[in-house]
């Protein structure tokens, strides 16, 4: 078994608005190994996106903790969490969230700029990642000049440009047609094999989830089962 990279212990998330209390996550516990490809499957409203926000340090659990590489996130300052997200985690969303006035190359380079890398390193690494996703020839195009599949590939290159140990992906193919969705998942698998990056993908699509090496099911804020989807039709 691979060394545990990320572990969540009894995560709970509760929102309070006036006298109304909403429990979104209930005692969620699981781990992700180094280099693992894992899917969490569930319908809209099951708590998947809230869980990813907690795992990425974008929100704080009501109780429980997230442990990344042996270090509890609850003990990290806001600045330390920001550094962790920049250096060790990558994020891919259903919508690409590319900056519209910047080229593909500039969008991919953004995490390196934030991390204050050297200019020569920034340019070469961003180009390297665009090449890895098959878009080096589109480096100087803005998002409006790219197709939906190309924009999502740029977003993936951006997520991986700092060579993160784990990428958190929230419905990464949700806005794509079947052909582009298939292409994106093939790309994630290839990057996992080449770079050893771990991926945790949340999705409602069983056909896409079955491509991951491990699948968990989430319902009403609870992990209910470990699925066996390999080869499922």
UniProtKB/Swiss-Prot annotation:
Origin: domain of life: Bacteria
SMART domains: AAA
Domain ABC transporter: 6-233
GO cellular component, one term: plasma membrane
GO molecular function, one term: transmembrane transporter activity
Membrane topology, from the record: Peripheral membrane protein
UniProt-annotated location(s): Cell inner membrane
Pfam family for this entry, one: ABC_tran
Any single GO BP term: protein localization to outer membrane
Keywords: ATP-binding, Cell inner membrane, Cell membrane, Membrane, Nucleotide-binding, Translocase, Transport
UniProt-listed PANTHER family: IMPORT ATP-BINDING PROTEIN, LIPOPROTEIN-RELEASING SYSTEM ATP-BINDING PROTEIN LOLD
Family to which the UniProt record says this protein belongs: Belongs to the ABC transporter superfamily. Lipoprotein translocase (TC 3.A.1.125) family.
Quaternary data: The complex is composed of two ATP-binding proteins (LolD) and two transmembrane proteins (LolC and LolE).
Protein's recorded name: Lipoprotein-releasing system ATP-binding protein LolD
């Amino acid at each position: 078994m691979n060394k545990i990279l990320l572990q969540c212990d009894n995560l709970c998330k509760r929102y309070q608005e006036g006298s109304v209390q909403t429990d979104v996550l209930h005692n969620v516990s699981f781990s992700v190994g180094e280099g693992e490809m894992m899917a969490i499957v569930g319908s809209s409203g099951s708590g998947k996106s809230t869980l990813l926000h907690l795992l990425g340090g974008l929100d704080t659990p009501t109780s429980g903790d997230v442990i990344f590489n042996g270090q509890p996130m609850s003990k990290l300052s806001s600045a330390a969490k920001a550094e962790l997200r920049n250096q060790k985690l990558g994020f891919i969303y259903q919508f690409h969230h590319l900056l519209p006035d910047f080229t593909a190359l500039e969008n991919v380079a953004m995490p390196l700029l934030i991390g204050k890398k050297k200019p020569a390193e920034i340019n070469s690494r961003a180009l390297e990642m665009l090449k890895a996703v098959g878009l080096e020839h589109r480096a100087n195009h803005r998002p409006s000049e790219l197709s939906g599949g190309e924009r999502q590939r740029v977003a993936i290159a951006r997520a991986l440009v700092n060579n993160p140990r784990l990428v958190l992906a929230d419905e990464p193919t949700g806005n794509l047609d079947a052909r582009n969705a298939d292409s994106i998942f093939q790309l994630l698998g290839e990057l996992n094999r080449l770079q050893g990056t771990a991926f945790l993908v949340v999705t409602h699509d069983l056909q896409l989830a079955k491509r991951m090496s491990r699948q968990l099911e989430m319902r009403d804020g609870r992990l209910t089962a470990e699925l066996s989807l390999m080869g499922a039709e």
